[in-house]
């Protein structure tokens, strides 16, 4: 069963075997991002309402917004879990990192003149890879690899070059069974990144596509969501 959301519409459970759908047991209006954490709780970012946490039965456990927490903005665009903490990519406020046990929130953000700060403050997607490194897809500032020891940013390059992206706005990220990282861009199609070599492969057949989401179905297949076109099994 998949938990899926159509941005600005409602979330649904989808039975992969039958294609049947059923509603979720929590408020699913205007959902921007969803995350199921390791405890099975569901974190939901509703547009301009911060972030709420629900148990698997739909009971609201907690909500975080600018009025009751250190969250700097209520527009949260992406959610990911890393070492038991909830990372929140925001629209203009950088990355907020929540400790669910204490409610404490720390922030990574762009600081003008500080080359060690986050390169961008609008983060559309977050991904925790198998090496426990974080990846952030930004608005017009490329792909950011965040490690304990520092950050590295990958920008767009000219067609045919393999040391950068086909498009600098990143919508989705997924690491496959072979540790290759699939990157969905906003109009540049799908890029495949090899962390071992640092090289990118631009998949030309997807050029100009807006790749809203990528995830794995099994070790040989990906499920890809293209903007305004639906889901595709690849």
Predicted regions and their residues:
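Carboxylate-rich, polar loop motifs that coordinate divalent cations or form catalytic acidic clusters
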Residues: 1-234
